[in-house]
Amino acid sequence: MVLTLLYVGRREGLGHERTRPTTNAGYEPGAREKWMRILFVHPEGNLANNPNLSAIIELLTRSGHEIIVRSARGNFARHENPNVRVLEVRYRIQRKLMQLSCHPRKWFLGKLLITLVPPMTPPADLVVGVDRQGLIEGAVIARSKGIPLAYWSYEIFFATECSSDFKALERREASSVRFAVAQDDLRARLLSEETGIPNDRILRIPVAGTGTRPAARTRYLNERFGIPADRRIAIFAGSVDEWTLARPLVESLPLWPENWVLVMHHRYGYVSDWQRSARHRMPSRFYLSEDSFPTIEGLGHMLHGADLGIALYNPTYDTPWTGRNIANIGMSSGKIATYMQYGLPVLINELGEISSHVREKGLGAVTGDVLEIPGILYHFDPESMRGRCLAFFAEHLDAKLYLPDLQRALSTAVAT
């Protein structure tokens, strides 16, 4: 529940002051607290499908801060909390901004689009740019309003994998950020090397939502797809592009134990031709979900009906997104974290820090090759791992664990 707060005044400096209503249990009557109006610039527009960013915004809102999100227009740009204000940028404008950000000499046109074309940005205390594009656009807003800038990095773009023009504006604007966020020590070091942001200014916050979702294994998927009750169900959620190894995984199905089946679910309900063909060839082994859920919570019904969550990452080096960024994914997989949040054991490949945790803490299995998966499944006991997955999420991944450090960084940025 988000508390309603009464504005009682403003002052220069750190945030503003409000008084909590005396009827709110757990707070001192008339207690005053500092709060901030924080603007997140998130051009990608998929807030509803980013479990970490959604959770962070929810937690900051519950803490009394006012949150505004500037994002590309679309159904997935909105936050489920009605108190989070979303400034929707028309698709045509957002696409143009992305094009211009790759040409530093033309970026003055991007600045004009941001400052003169709706939506107009209200006053704020601090801007958080999400990923490269959010940093570049957020810097324009922060500079125009004379407020500090922070950088939340989910993707790392390497100079060796993209053009100098593509990196130029990111490097320039990164020089003015008060702090940044990466997911683990390795990604923080790489982000520092690629942007020039000092490593000691980078917080470590894994990609994960907040709150475990324990539940007994349901028959949701069995009933949804007509899967026999004696089958164990592996689910593969998310993109099926080449870097996910989705196609080799499906091709390995004839070698799986007879009591295992695979369900694939794309976040937006997309189904490719090769998937339809595979379903036609293996109707009793391979099932496709064409549902599209407006929030991460909708996916939970599917995860509670599965026995295993599969997440595979294989760098293809054909775009700046799918090279070293994928090779060093570490603790930045929201898919793996979401599986564990729902008590679902995981099957992953060699991904750095998260793979070590899975091995050492008994959270599932780690494979070096898709062809090893059938052998792993013959001896896999998911029920013994569910509790450990929930505990690991609660103790290491939950976004609320990192809220105190984040709030200190926000307060320091605004105060200096």
Predicted regions and their residues:
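Membrane-proximal helix-turn-helix segments that form the acceptor-binding/catalytic region
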Residues: 114-118, 136, 151, 156-183
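A short, active-site helix/loop in glycosyltransferases that binds the activated sugar's phosphate group
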Residues: 175-202, 209-213, 352, 356-360
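A short helix/loop element that forms part of the nucleotide-sugar donor recognition site in Leloir-type
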Residues: 213-227
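Active-site proximal beta-strand in glycosyltransferases
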Residues: 126, 140-159
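Nucleotide-activated donor-binding/catalytic signature segment of Leloir-type glycosyltransferases, i.e.
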Residues: 274-308, 318
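A charged, aromatic-enriched C-terminal amphipathic alpha-helix characteristic of glycosyltransferases
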Residues: 206, 368-371, 381-412
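Conserved donor-binding/catalytic core segment of Leloir-type glycosyltransferases
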Residues: 41, 227-244, 249-253
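N-terminal subdomain of nucleotide-sugar transferases
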Residues: 1-78, 247, 251-257
